[in-house]
Amino acid sequence: MRCPFCGAPDTRVIDSRLAGEGDQVRRRRECLSCSERFTTYENAELNMPRVVKRDGSREPFNEDKLKSGMTHALEKRAVSTDKVEEAVARIKRKLLGQGEREVDSRRIGEWVMEELRNLDQVAYIRFASVYLSFADVQAFREVIERLEKDLTPEMRKHQIPLLGDEEGEGKD
């Protein structure tokens, strides 16, 4: 691999390890000319299915678009970039696991909502408000109430209530 510092054509690998939940290889390299070190990541090149949009149009799967949508919902929330990367990797594995050449965008949206629900309630609500196109405040409240009701004890430990506590505090 060419050195990004001096442009020399020869580098050597000094360390390799798995990264990204095992679907990436992280390599530390050293240039044989200038001795600078740098990191590279190796991913398998996979043929992702095409996405069928609501209007029937088709487009190639875009990981950056998926990550951007999730990151936007998680803006100013205490969720690490690593957690987002792991969620994106799980969604990609689901896409590949379908074994289909095309996948409906609604299915991807459902997987994103599932991942956000597990990461952060506020991000889930932010995404759902756009994805589900709430008609009114009542529809918004119903999704929040369903979300709070469906939380597992483990998830409840890591989240703050959206509508007050179990005793009805904060509810009118």
Curated annotation (Swiss-Prot):
Cofactor: Zn(2+)
Gene Ontology MF: a single term: zinc ion binding
PROSITE patterns listed in its UniProt record: ATP_CONE (PS51161)
InterPro entries: ATP-cone_dom, NrdR-like_N, RNR_NrdR-like
Keyword Transferase: no
Coiled coil: none
Residue ranges constituting the ATP-cone domain according to the UniProt record: 49-139
Keywords recorded for this protein, A-Z: ATP-binding, DNA-binding, Metal-binding, Nucleotide-binding, Repressor, Transcription, Transcription regulation, Zinc, Zinc-finger
Position of the signal peptide: none
Zinc finger regions, unnamed: 3-34
Swiss-Prot/TrEMBL GO biological process terms: negative regulation of DNA-templated transcription
Cofactor stoichiometry and binding remark: Binds 1 zinc ion.
Family: Belongs to the NrdR family.
Function as written in the Swiss-Prot or TrEMBL entry: Negatively regulates transcription of bacterial ribonucleotide reductase nrd genes and operons by binding to NrdR-boxes.
Protein name: Transcriptional repressor NrdR
The organism's taxonomic lineage, starting at the top: Bacteria, Pseudomonadati, Pseudomonadota, Gammaproteobacteria, Chromatiales
